[in-house]
């Protein structure tokens, strides 16, 4: 019984130390989670249960080791973080203050990616490359950007300040400040709050589904072919009767 109580005491002390360290070194990220996640009820919940925060802690340590030219261990640490959180951030990625990764499973951030301040990313986001080129090959995300679930931002492009990228969009070109991007490939549908002519309704509950759109086009083509076949058969019937 004494041994059990001692173990509980040690675990409690370690948890307290972990909590204090996280509050000191990740205060901006913890505040971001509290502000942007309506499900967050208290700071302790964020510190102990938010995978995005744990992934950032692993990345900060791995990034520092990489800056010190420590071999191998930065990648090992990043892979440990991936295993624990489902979020893969390369040690070479540069991340600003106040990043909030919500849910986080499947998020990938490439080696030369740069993320500014107060960015929000949801599950399934990829900041990736487009080939095997060397040098800067991943996107630069500026400040106050929101990247929806499943979105892919690819290549050495720049996403400007205050940009909203819709869920499942595939962005392969630069995005200007104060824009909203949707679709595959991603296109600007709103800029500075104004709809682009011919743009899409950007109510978040009505963001376009590219697969659904493709199915609708196919169904339209099938209906058209069926109509033509019907007219052809009617013509054949009339010829036979005459």
What are these regions (language model features)?
Residues 1-80, 196-242:
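Terminal amphipathic alpha-helical/low-complexity segments used for targeting or macromolecular assembly
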Residues 82-189:
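Structural signal for interior beta-strand "rungs" in well-ordered beta-sheet cores
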Residues 193:
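P-loop NTPase switch/communication element
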């Amino acid at each position: 019984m004494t041994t059990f109580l001692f173990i509980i005491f040690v675990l409690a002390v370690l948890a307290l130390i972990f909590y204090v360290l996280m509050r000191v070194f990740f205060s901006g990220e913890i505040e971001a989670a509290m502000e942007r996640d309506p499900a967050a009820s208290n700071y302790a919940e964020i510190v102990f249960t938010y995978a995005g925060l744990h992934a950032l802690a692993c990345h900060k340590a791995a990034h520092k080791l990489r800056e010190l030219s420590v071999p191998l261990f930065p990648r090992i640490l990043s892979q440990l973080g991936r295993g624990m959180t489902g979020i893969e951030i390369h040690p070479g990625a540069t991340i600003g203050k106040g990043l909030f990764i919500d849910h986080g499973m499947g998020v990938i951030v490439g080696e030369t990616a740069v993320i500014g301040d107060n960015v929000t990313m949801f599950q399934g986001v990829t900041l990736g490359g487009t080939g095997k080129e060397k040098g800067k090959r991943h996107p630069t995300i500026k400040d106050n950007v929101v990247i929806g679930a499943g979105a892919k931002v690819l290549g050495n492009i720049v996403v400007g300040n205050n940009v909203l990228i819709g869920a499942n969009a595939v962005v392969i070109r630069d995005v200007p400040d104060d824009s909203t991007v949707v679709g595959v490939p991603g296109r600007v549908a709103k800029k500075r709050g104004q709809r682009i002519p011919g743009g899409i309704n950007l109510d978040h509950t009505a963001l376009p589904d590219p697969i659904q759109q493709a199915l609708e086009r196919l169904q339209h083509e099938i209906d058209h072919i069926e109509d033509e076949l019907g007219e052809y058969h009617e013509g054949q019937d009339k010829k036979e009767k005459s």
